Amino acid sequence: MRIEGELVKAKFVKRLNRFVALVEVDGVQEFAHVPNTGRLKELLVDGAAVMVRKYDKTDRKTRFGLILVRKNGIWVSIDSANAPNRIMYEALVQGKFDKFRDYSEIRREVTVLNSRFDFGLFSEGKEYYIEVKGVTLVENRQGFFPDAPTQRGTRHLEELTKIRQNGKEAGVAFIVQREDADVVRPNDRTDKNFANALRIAAEAGVDLMAYVCKVDAEQRRMDIVREIPVIIK
């Protein structure tokens, strides 16, 4: 997946609130939009090397968007608002997943029951609904989701469980936005409700998938490089 826009090297200074951070670009402090409502405490540390997207539109509240962070010698994408869905959509369209190749139609933002899911796949009476979650928190090569409580995420899991119980197929795809994870686990420490809902969903037959991405700042790319297990014990 191509990382869109003009990327500029910068230095992280501090996070002002969930949506805005202070960064230093060419020696000048600038406001940057943070496209991720997670805590990101292990990534957004004073002095961290970052890449920001420069915006040309003058009607934006900030001139930059905080897109990549350097951590332990690798680049991490913190764009959870757009990147996970984009990379999943490209992979589906390109037929990269064997289990989804039989579906002839891909729809985005599909409403079922009381929730809107990222993707609906359809083919000759078959239906498969996918919710995508971006993972940025990795500790000891273990990815954890979420890194902040998410009632919306828990509700999605509950609705996917109902869909599966009604006889339709459903799955959760965790997109790990960095290359240094070998497994993904629910983050019980941060959101026990989400973790329990994930286990209930798995017991009901909801598929749990996780894909690791390599982020290349020089080439302006983020690509899925391998699938890893989701461990819920």
Curated annotation (Swiss-Prot):
Alphabetical list of Gene3D superfamilies matching this protein: 2.40.50.580, 3.40.1350.60
Superkingdom, natural source: Bacteria
Coiled coil regions in record: none
Segments passing through the bilayer: none
An MF annotation (GO) of this entry: DNA binding
Family indicated by similarity: Belongs to the SfsA family.
Protein known as: Sugar fermentation stimulation protein homolog
Encoding gene, per UniProt annotation: sfsA
